[in-house]
Amino acid sequence: MDHVKLVGDPIDISHIHELLLDDGCGASSVFVGTTRDNFQGKKVVSLAYEAYDNMAIKEMNKICSDLRSKWPGLKHIVIHHRLGTVPVREASVVIAASSPHRSEALESVSFAIDQLKTRVPIWKKEIYEGDHEAEWKENKESIRAKQSLSSFNYSACPCQVEESHEVPQKLVQIRVNDAELSKRLECFVNRKRDEINSQNIIDFKHPPADSVPELSDSCARTQSTVIKQEKSNCHIKVRRVNNRSFPQQMELRPNYELELNKLMGSRDGQNEPSVKMRKSLYDSRLLTIESYMGLAPKSEDDIFSRIKTLEDRILLLESISPEYKHFTNIEPSSLEPPAPKKTRKKSYSAHELGMLIEKIKNE
């Protein structure tokens, strides 16, 4: 059976022995790691351990699985690690295994402690006596890249939290001071600014000619040049939109020339339009269109071509500007004959009529 646990209290070694007991086992191997009182001439008071709990438990269970795959005869495996402050001479980690033979127990425990130091995310901080600053220590056996370790500065992360507002360690993910955080934000902003500047140079600056040396202190803001797109008046790419209806969609409009040929085209000599029919067509179509366009009829020659030309002109104006009617110089109403002015006849009195008669007689 596997016994994996992270504890905050002192580890009970007698309890570990009870977990290893089994009638079929003839050997038990126990490793106990304790806190020593010195490091490189400095007096060590205690060790402080922190861990990413969920991942640490997961990795410790994987170590147990690896042990059983290498030594199938193992009966019980115990891995207990203490978190928090561990004073001198107290146990910080206990790894034990029981098996029918001593070789499997001894080899498995040695392998387990090496894997624990290498894989499990547990960090150790040494607290020294006197004015020496505490230091976070890395495991030499760790498989993590040195770059990732150096980028995380544990010593620059003083954490002062009131006891009434204590935050669980597993919820803290950014453990840097304000200066380090500001530095990272500044680097991020500078990198984004460089990307924008590079894109502006591509969009607004001509590539330097062979004869003109490139200026080292030039930028798109001071030496920008608008590069016009093909068939466009600006540097922005313009796409043509094909409407499915309305004046721009000319394909959906009827073929007027074909319709006119069907109605007025000559089929046989006997079916040619009569003079009356020609006059009717002229009055109903040609005169209306030419009046609307502000044109006066000049000749009756090639009447169908004139109709087709006028209709094409109207279609063109509609496609360009539907409001073209409001900008024509000659309004259709101006071609109509002016209405006769209504004048009111003057009324004469009897005295005025008498004077007018006397004047005529005297002449």
Curated annotation (Swiss-Prot):
Q: What is its main location?
A: cytoplasm
Any idea which UniProt keywords this protein has?
Cytoplasm, Molybdenum cofactor biosynthesis, Transferase
- Tell me which GO cellular component terms the UniProt record holds: ATAC complex; cytosol; molybdopterin synthase complex; polytene chromosome
tRNA-binding as UniProt keyword: no
EC numbers: 2.8.1.12
Task: Reply yes or no: does the keyword Cytoplasm apply.
Answer: yes
* Pathway the protein contributes to: Cofactor biosynthesis; molybdopterin biosynthesis
Q: Name one Pfam family in it.
A: MoaE
Look up the domain of life of the source.
Answer: Eukaryota
Q: Where is this region: Disordered?
A: 329-349
Query: Quaternary structure per UniProt?
Result: Heterotetramer; composed of 2 small (Mocs2A) and 2 large (Mocs2B) subunits.
The protein's matches in HAMAP family, at most eight in alphabetical order, are given as: MOC2B
What is the designated name of this protein? Molybdopterin synthase catalytic subunit
Biological source species: Drosophila ananassae (Fruit fly)
Q: What is the lineage of its organism?
A: Eukaryota, Metazoa, Ecdysozoa, Arthropoda, Hexapoda
